[in-house]
Amino acid sequence: DFQTWQLGQMGFDFIKVDAFTPDNLPEVRNSYWNKWRRPLRPAERARLLSHGMAWDWVAENGPALIIEDDAVLARSVPNILENLEQINDIEYLSLEVRGRRKLLSKTAIPIGHGVASHRLYLDRLGSAAYVLWPNGAKKLIRRASKGAVSLDGIAQWATSVKCFQADPACAVQLDMATEYGLSAPIESNSTTEKNAAPKALTIAQTCRLFLAQAHKIWRLCRYGLVAERRKIELRPEFFDI
């Protein structure tokens, strides 16, 4: 498949997780899924459980690049991963861009090949390509054990994790490739949009959503002097497709 080919071209040794799908979700009590701020679609539930297996591996074995099967990587990613071994105090680094603005620190740490790492305070979309360290993995596992979460916007709910963002972005999902001037090598098979719309919010979920919005405003105010809300650039010349 595409991802096996891409990782082979980059010289990566990798482990392919046998991901869950909406058709083979295990039995999980409804009270677990209902603890998020809105109903999660079957595809979102499958993604959470699949990424959870990767988090378990990182927590036990060490830092790793976690990517979904439709993530396209910049050619510099292998060298950037080597450079990250010399950088401390990062627990999660998003490589991806998906069109939305993010709240990023104004200062940055160079990580090679014209790419810098900014502290990431708010994010709404994207979990197709990220680097995760054991401390970050343990925090994500601990948070997810308390109740279901959406993988989109990890920096928004995993506030104890030291999250960073690569800029310019080093990855993009296939369904967004053409938006950034890239030619998609294969057709995207993203499943999230193909699922039926979720049910109406419960009273508890409405309260959680309100609190989440209030927390977002609080973070915007707290980091307003040291951060800026902007879109992440992606440079097509960094990619081989």
PLM feature segments, named:
Residues 1-67, 71-241:
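An acidic/histidine-cluster motif and surrounding catalytic segment
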